Amino acid sequence: MAKSFPVFSLLSFILIHLVLSSVSGPRHWWPPRGIIKVKCPYEKVNLSWYNGTVNPCPGLYQPICGTNFITYDNPCILCVESLKSHGRIRFYHDGKC
């Protein structure tokens, strides 16, 4: 019994992993490869209570073109502009315009 426990544990772990990965679907890693699908938040977050400096967009350089034909340094900056324009500016395509 003592020798079969590690084998049983390993098989159980593999089975659970396979079931969970098939149920939860594929994982999406950042940065994505190929076509970038940008999903921006629909409303601003009130951070007036925060006294520090807020940098919502890190220094990632991944050029992206907006529907206004302006190139943004990364999807985060495009999302900020989308919020400012009340959704009129959206993702158009990967890369520079």
From Swiss-Prot:
Superkingdom per UniProt: Eukaryota
Positions marked as site (Reactive bond): 59-60
Record-linked SMART domains: KAZAL
Cellular component terms per the entry's GO annotation: extracellular region
Swiss-Prot/TrEMBL keywords: Disulfide bond, Glycoprotein, Protease inhibitor, Secreted, Serine protease inhibitor, Signal
PROSITE patterns registered for this protein in UniProt: KAZAL_1, KAZAL_2
Residues that carry a glycan: 51
Signal peptide: 1-21
Disulfide bond residue pairs: 40-79, 57-76, 65-97
Domain Kazal-like: 34-97
Compartments, as annotated in UniProt: Secreted
Record-linked Gene3D superfamilies: 3.30.60.30
Any one GO MF annotation of this record: serine-type endopeptidase inhibitor activity
Keyword Disulfide bond listed: yes
Record's function text: May be a serine protease inhibitor.
Protein name from the UniProt record: Serine protease inhibitor Kazal-type 14
UniProt organism field: Homo sapiens (Human)
